[in-house]
Curated annotation (Swiss-Prot):
Keywords: Nucleus, Repeat, Transcription, Transcription regulation, WD repeat. This is Protein TEX1. It comes from Saccharomyces cerevisiae (strain ATCC 204508 / S288c) (Baker's yeast). Residues 405-416 have a biased composition (Basic and acidic residues). Component of the transcription/export (TREX) complex and the THO complex. The gene is TEX1. One of its GO terms (molecular function) is mRNA binding. Component of the TREX complex, which operates in coupling transcription elongation to mRNA export. Belongs to the THOC3 family.
Amino acid sequence: MSTIGAVDILNQKTITSEVAASVTSKYLQSTFSKGNTSHIEDKRFIHVSSRSHSRFTSTPITPNEILSLKFHVSGSSMAYSRMDGSLTVWFIKDASFDKSVEVYIPDCCGSDKLATDLSWNPTSLNQIAVVSNSSEISLLLINEKSLTASKLRTLSLGSKTKVNTCLYDPLGNWLLAATKSEKIYLFDVKKDHSSVCSLNISDISQEDNDVVYSLAWSNGGSHIFIGFKSGYLAILKAKHGILEVCTKIKAHTGPITEIKMDPWGRNFITGSIDGNCYVWNMKSLCCELIINDLNSAVTTLDVCHLGKILGICTEDEMVYFYDLNSGNLLHSKSLANYKTDPVLKFYPDKSWYIMSGKNDTLSNHFVKNEKNLITYWKDMFDNTMIEKRRKNNGGGNNHNKRTSKNTDRIGKDRPSRFNSKK
């Protein structure tokens, strides 16, 4: 497992690949510090905290795993469903979540039903599609002021259909839904979510009785990527409400548990129960990078908004952060004592992320006042240069004026100092 070596960051005046990797590694380490980590104090956190601090409770805390966690594309809100049937929505106001608004919906799909998946409508700040392994897709409207959810409408697909996955395309034109092994469905969002197309799973996969394990849209919403239990990857073209199979690849030797797009459209990434992650070139569909040193099944993965960090969760309760460009390991974290199913999700507009806490709680990881890696490096460099000049000038009272002038000059020189080599 290749790791990032030490680089003297502060003596570098351009961002080379080595400097970028070192900055990223340092940034990730800082996100685990106490000052840059905050608990998301939802209903689950309150329950766990009250049980943990009670002297009169000896029974174990009942698990309540996260089933699906999604950010709105704007980064202004996120939603997640749990095994108890609840849906929690946060309208995010700050890094620590202290001022954020929580909307809690118990039994969001009705009693005895679980919200197996959810997806934000990217063209609306408060509309979510939810599925529950049933014949219905619920379109919910979340009200931030009244802290309630109302059902806009229900999409029905026939009594024997069991839809367990749904996904809006990035432009908000289409809603995709899928059962495990029967069909995928396409809805036209602009035409009141009318059903326009369906396709049998047997017509997509190479294997008989195959099962859908993962879905993803391309960044432009023109193609659909489907990962199967067999390890096959199918790519479909979506145009004018018609789905057409373009490519089938035997991508993995086990089920493909996750598919993610590089935000720049260069690559897509697949993770599998076979313990491997592959980075594929979007144009050639050739595998460009293999991460095969995880030693455990990949349960989920995500990519940061800059396309620099690949986060991977594995079945043995580990979280890994890799450099997506080089495949080198940047940082890792064991969740072995957390008693939780690992969860990792990057914000869509910054280098912060949400990760599993103990007993199925969630924690927010960030660096204060730093929304991405570039500003993190620039501010670190600036502060160090100012401190060096202050020390060189003696730092005494007799030199206050000269220090002030030097500081001003740093501000003027700054643009030329950060001309990066690409």
